[in-house]
Amino acid sequence: MNIIDELEWRGAIYQQTDEEGLRKWVEEKQISLYCGIDPSGDSMHIGHLIPFMILRRFQNAGHRPIILVGGATGTIGDPSGKKEERKLQSMEQISKNVESLRVQLGKIFDFEGDSAASMVNNYDWTKDVSILDFLRDYGKEFNVNTMLSKDIVASRLEVGISFTEFAYQILQAMDFNHLYEFNDCRLQIGGSDQWGNITAGLDLIRKKQGENAKAFGLTIPLLTKADGTKFGKSEGGAIWLNPEKTTPYEFYQFWINTDDRDVVKYLKYFTFLTEAEIDELAKQVEEEPHLRAAQKTLAAEMTKFVHSEEALEQALKISKALFSGDVTALTADEIEQGFKDVPTFVAEDAEVNLVDWLVTLGIEPSKRQAREDVTNGAIYINGERQQNVEKVIDASDRIENKFTIVRRGKKKYFLVSYK
């Protein structure tokens, strides 16, 4: 199957320039193509992942992906999709963000073999361009009327846009032209809001490299959820690729909780499963939705891809422990992941009566209520039911000498750490 046909089947193409020419080019040649990201933060979220998944599909089809981290464009900020001016960050912060993104993107691609990926930073070829060079060599190639007509600029004219952000499309066009000239890059991929920037690059390539220069652009549709809300966010905020911001367990749970109406679309977008495999999962969604086979597959595939097989095993282990209530097999790291959002208390490193301990920490409102809950078997320590009001909490009740997990009733968890 031609890679363009596969992308169309997956619903991953919104717009493309010269479809016939691109189809022929990717069938006959191994091409280099790129997608960029600006280091506006120290982590990608899953919304950022979408165009890079397309880039990875091209790599799987034998083409060479170029990952561009915008050390230069990141100092300005892309106005696309923004209603107001971005706040500029320091060069020091941008440099830190660049390195963080390099690590995350490095996990997604293969950097060896015939279709080895490469990673570039546009700061390397823009840092020595003087203002006069910029105006003479590039500014002269851009018609202001054309720039004003592009959606990314036109949508901001009423509220105002600085020259800095207005000129962003020139810098992105310079990137495409540079990669065309020095890396033989023929295709740029981006989100649907990048169409204006991509076509600006194609225009510059034709002016700089000649009318016969072959280059293409492809954008991806905006991904929305069936309920109309924005994809990539949970109640707790964005779902990050950085495990310190979104743990692998939280990441896994995000995908597990996918709506039945969205799961097949996400399987097509985000996994490398075949059409036959996805069709079978779609059938299961229709016939046995309660088994959530499609969601489990999606969560497993994504956690492995972004994190690792080990991270997936941890997420499954935590999920099983929380479902069964048997938490004794969890490590301290797994406890921190699985209980990140439960009420957390810090206890003194001392032996204390269970009833007093529950009240002192604030898990129980009074000794009377604490005794009643213990007597009725509603209190669990590390998954074990406690019915002895005389029990003493000591070091033996700690997991890895760090945590004690308290459960009240069937689902109310508390995490206790120690001074």
From Swiss-Prot:
Pfam families: SYY_C-terminal, tRNA-synt_1b. GO terms for biological process: tyrosyl-tRNA aminoacylation. It is an enzyme of class 6 (ligase). A motif ('KMSKS' region) lies at residues 230-234. It catalyses: tRNA(Tyr) + L-tyrosine + ATP = L-tyrosyl-tRNA(Tyr) + AMP + diphosphate + H(+). A motif ('HIGH' region) lies at residues 39-48. InterPro entries: aa-tRNA-synth_I_CS, aa-tRNA-synth_Ic, Rossmann-like_a/b/a_fold, S4_RNA-bd, S4_RNA-bd_sf, SYY-like_C, Tyr-tRNA-ligase, Tyr-tRNA-ligase_bac-type. One of its GO terms (cellular component) is cytosol. ATP binds at K233. L-tyrosine binds at Y34, Y168, Q172. Belongs to the class-I aminoacyl-tRNA synthetase family. TyrS type 1 subfamily. Homodimer. This is Tyrosine--tRNA ligase.
